[in-house]
């Protein structure tokens, strides 16, 4: 719903025709990337956040009624967008900064406004940091950098590659070759499913139609195609430069630091340790290809909107939309599995779990295990029995704090001070401390221990 509303507003910026806006918004609603992320990484399917950044950039020439609004409304809106971005997923924030870069260029070189872009930068940075602080991002000393930089990048073929599900995209697309009904997947390097930014055959066809139309127009006017391109660039010079810069910056980061075309490595960039540490905070660099993808969407729709004959314009757009629907229909059908009601069956089948959990208000799993199967199994059991749990699955866990807590728990147990209301669950028998009088229960692959005093 939000993707549709925001895309309609975006298209309305350059075409006021309601039918064109509604049909054009379909491309953003059924974006292959959005469909890929649904039911797997839902926060990363909220692409209306990206579209809002693009909207603020394209609407920066909006005429405000009052002078203070002319100066401060855009900084306020950029700041609010920063709050929204970090509240949903931190990866959206650098994408928004890409559009803010475009805003800088057009504000300074086209609209001659030098203060406003800096106020926008200050506002979005300050309010984003404030929101992160309110969410507890600075509560622990966790290392936000993570391994995988260069693995989860985008392939240079990302815009026309529908991918497959045999290892290259970790099964996120469903059945084999279901990214597109018409195009075959192209091999990519392991982990580059994160850089999935297939635009769809409808958009590709739209771009081809625009190219053919431009050639025909040049022939009809007895002018070279290059002359028409120069004329267009002259009228939209600053916007074209800004768009090219935003696209180049986003794509350079998306394919970095190891660039691949298909399975062939093109180049490696060896950054300093400090830069690598910073980039590793956003290790899935391939996601920033989404900025380029939506710029392509918008550019193609803008080109189609320039067709002077209204009926032809709507007809061509509708045709491209039908092709897009047909192309990604396999991807949409692969998501039908999630429409069926699923019954959760806990692997903790032994009735002894219920008896041992009586009177406990917390579950302590030892040692820390990042396995999602273990974490979710124990967490669901704890939730259903109104117990807290000592750790859960998070993106950047504070390993030092977790390790210290582990040693503290083990020391308390060894000293005979086990928490009387805790259900101690060990993942392996070797980690159970030797305490006289302790009773060990092996249940469904786990070891539940009742220590003296419990």
Q: What is the predicted role of each segment?
A:
Residues 20-40, 130-141, 162-174, 241-281, ...:
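Membrane-interface helix-loop junctions at the exits of transmembrane helices
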Residues 81, 104, 111-135, 146-151, ...:
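Hydrophobic alpha-helical membrane-interfacial segments at the cytosolic entry of transmembrane helices
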Residues 94-126, 210-227:
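Perimembrane helix-loop-helix junctions
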Residues 101, 122, 126, 298, ...:
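Signature aromatic-anchored transmembrane alpha helix within multi-pass, membrane-resident enzymes
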Residues 127-214:
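Periplasmic/ER-lumenal interhelical loops and adjacent helix-loop junctions
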Residues 328-454:
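Extracytoplasmic
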């Amino acid at each position: 719903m939000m993707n549709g509303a925001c895309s309609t507003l975006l298209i309305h910026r350059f075409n006021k025709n309601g039918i064109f806006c509604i049909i054009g918004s379909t491309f953003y609603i059924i974006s292959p990337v959005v469909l890929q992320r649904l039911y797997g990484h839902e926060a990363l399917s909220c692409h209306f956040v990206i579209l809002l950044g693009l909207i603020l950039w394209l609407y920066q020439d909006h005429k405000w009624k009052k002078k203070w609004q002319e100066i401060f409304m855009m900084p306020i809106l950029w700041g609010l967008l920063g709050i929204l971005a970090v509240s949903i997923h931190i990866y959206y924030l650098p994408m928004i900064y890409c559009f803010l870069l475009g805003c800088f260029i057009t504000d300074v070189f086209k609209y001659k406004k030098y203060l406003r872009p800096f106020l926008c930068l200050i506002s979005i940075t300050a309010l984003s940091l404030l929101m992160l602080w309110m969410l507890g991002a600075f509560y622990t000393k966790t290392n936000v950098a993570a391994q995988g930089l260069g693995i989860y990048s985008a392939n240079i073929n990302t815009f026309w590659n529908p991918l497959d599900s045999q290892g290259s995209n970790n099964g996120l697309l469903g059945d084999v070759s279901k990214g597109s009904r018409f195009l075959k997947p192209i091999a990519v390097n392991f982990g580059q499913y994160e850089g999935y930014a297939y635009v769809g055959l409808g958009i590709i066809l739209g771009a081809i139609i625009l190219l053919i139309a431009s050639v025909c127009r040049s022939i009809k006017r007895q002018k070279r195609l290059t002359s028409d391109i120069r004329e267009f660039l002259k009228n939209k010079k600053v916007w074209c430069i800004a768009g090219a810069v935003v696209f180049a910056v986003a794509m350079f980061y998306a394919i970095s630091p190891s660039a691949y075309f298909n399975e062939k490595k093109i180049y490696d960039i060896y950054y300093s340790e400090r830069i690598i540490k910073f980039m590793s905070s956003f290790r899935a660099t391939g996601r920033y290809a989404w900025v380029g993808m939506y710029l392509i969407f918008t550019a193609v729709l803008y080109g189609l909107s320039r067709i002077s004959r209204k009926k032809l314009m709507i007809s061509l757009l509708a045709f491209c939309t039908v092709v897009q629907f047909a192309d990604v229909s396999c991807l949409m059908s692969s998501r039908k599995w999630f429409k069926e009601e699923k019954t959760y069956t806990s692997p903790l089948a032994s009735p002894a779990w219920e008896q041992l959990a009586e009177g406990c208000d917390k579950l302590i799993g030892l040692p820390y295990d990042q396995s999602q199967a273990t974490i979710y199994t124990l967490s669901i059991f704890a939730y259903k029995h109104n117990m807290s749990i000592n750790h859960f699955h998070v993106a950047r866990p504070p390993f030092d704090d977790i390790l210290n807590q582990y040693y503290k728990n083990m020391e308390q147990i060894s000293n005979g001070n086990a928490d009387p209301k805790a259900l101690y669950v060990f993942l392996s028998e070797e980690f159970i401390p030797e305490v006289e009088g302790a009773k060990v229960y092996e249940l469904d692959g786990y070891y539940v221990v009742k220590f003296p005093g419990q």
